[in-house]
């Protein structure tokens, strides 16, 4: 699969979200960070903004729910127009049931793991998912430095995906930039959330294209891709 670049609107101008979405129309998805000031120490946006964004852009929405009680709230984001909904393993009471509900409502189901959460306990759950998100920073704030210590975890996750023959996307989020995206792709990631690296650029659309080119080149040389 070709690398996918998902600009994070956490780094966009919140007063101009519709315009900021249009500025990256060549992106694969628009990454929407939902934070509740409980699961993470920050508060961003909710269902009404997602509904408005879904009307304002043709780019599908990739909603990352950094919230408590995702079992209750995640289905509402599908109804609001999200094409993919990510809940956190650390917050979900019944992740299999929730993933199935998200899928039943018509969206892709994704689960996120914080840096300290190992992937191995969730191996048997992976077939229930369309994507797994490996956080490469502590969730809650944009603009953080990439955690290199997550690269072995990305590799182990890719190995699990191959072991089970899954068509599971592997997303990374946090500190992804021109300086780090190739390492992520080499380790096994194929979906890349980029905030500051896109919206901090003078030409966000060109930044998306450049990141995709870098990721595709690194993937082509990666051992996991050559073995696929």
UniProtKB/Swiss-Prot annotation:
Transmembrane segments: none annotated. It catalyses: D-ribulose 5-phosphate = D-xylulose 5-phosphate. Its EC number is 5.1.3.1. InterPro entries: Aldolase_TIM (IPR013785), Ribul_P_3_epim (IPR026019), Ribul_P_3_epim-like (IPR000056), RibuloseP-bd_barrel (IPR011060). The active site is at 33 (proton acceptor), 173 (proton donor). Substrate binds at residues 8, 64, 140-143, 173-175, 195-196. CDD domains: RPE. Keywords: Carbohydrate metabolism, Isomerase, Metal-binding. Its cofactor is a divalent metal cation. One of its GO terms (cellular component) is cytosol. It is an enzyme of class 5 (isomerase). GO terms for molecular function: D-ribulose-phosphate 3-epimerase activity; metal ion binding. Signal peptide: none annotated. The keyword Transmembrane helix does not apply. It comes from the Bacteria. Belongs to the ribulose-phosphate 3-epimerase family. HAMAP family: RPE. Catalyzes the reversible epimerization of D-ribulose 5-phosphate to D-xylulose 5-phosphate. This is Ribulose-phosphate 3-epimerase. It comes from Streptomyces coelicolor (strain ATCC BAA-471 / A3(2) / M145).
